[in-house]
Amino acid sequence: MAGRTVLTLYAVHAARPEADGGRGGKSGGAMDTSRPDDHDRDTDEDAEAPGTAHPATGASRRSWRNRSPALRGTGGAALTADRAGRWRDLQEVSLDLSQRKLRKERLVAIDRRDAHLSGSFDMLRTRLITALKANGWRRVAITSPTAGCGKTFCAINLAISLSRLQAVRTVLLDLDLRAPGIAGALGLQPTAPMSDLLTGARDMHAHLVRIGGNLALGLNDTPIPDSAETLQAPQTARALKAMQFDLRPDVVLYELPPALGHDDLFAFLPQIDAVLLIADGTHTTAEDISACERILSDRTPLLGVVLNKADDPDSRRHAKRGS
């Protein structure tokens, strides 16, 4: 298997027991087999409205699924149509699907000629969805201990794999404000710097773009020096809550800078439910992973550790891009 990226989810964080004695500590919930528009039946009863204080991550919380019969009538239908329309109103863009581009950027979840590798992302997708469903989570940070572990590669291919699930809407935001890479890897031009979206200077619908029916992207190609300060600013929290409230995605993936050496991940913990850690099989050490676990401590669950590039000679190319 020389020269092949090996993707292995070798550690899955068990769910914490519910404070009310509800779900146990297993993360083996069934896949969501609802119809494509079922998630649009959610209503404001359980949603986080912009400006609403969020409970500590990992704590017991209600599902966003509507439980109020009173809200299943005309008002709920209007909300459903409105939010579905907001998703569809996002500018739709197309990817360069030439074999040269797919090979260069290793968009294996699109190419799918490498059945082993694309299948690995599908397996990761299924485990992710199962864990999120079991715990009532939606917001996942994707990071790595250090640069060069392939977190951008993993974030993009995981998002694309998720987008093939008809009943799941996914948003992928490039919040590695130190070294953004998603736009370049996909060959797309951001409409504006991510900082404009986070500070409220630019409307969400003017910034996010949509690929197909189920994947929305928040792109960036402009690094900013005060990355951690921006991520923990109140206006950032408000902007992200507004995005979730308006679009009601089923999964939100945030790519963040490497966890060690910067405080971006720590600063952003209040905005996420769980963390997916990308480790490099060629240089990530057990101490690196332990250091990341100490950052998370009891604040945010570690959803899993993905061992990437176990025997991939291209890791240096990814390291140069800070991904």
List each language-model region with its residue ranges:
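C-terminal lobe/tail of nucleotide-utilizing enzymes
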Residues: 2-16, 25-121, 230, 287-323
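Phosphate-binding P-loop
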Residues: 131-137
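Hydrophobic anchor at the beta1->P-loop junction of P-loop NTPases
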Residues: 140-143
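Active-site signature of alpha/beta-hydrolase-fold catalytic machinery across serine-
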Residues: 157, 161
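Short helix C-cap/helix-to-loop transition motifs enriched in small/turn-promoting residues
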Residues: 164-165
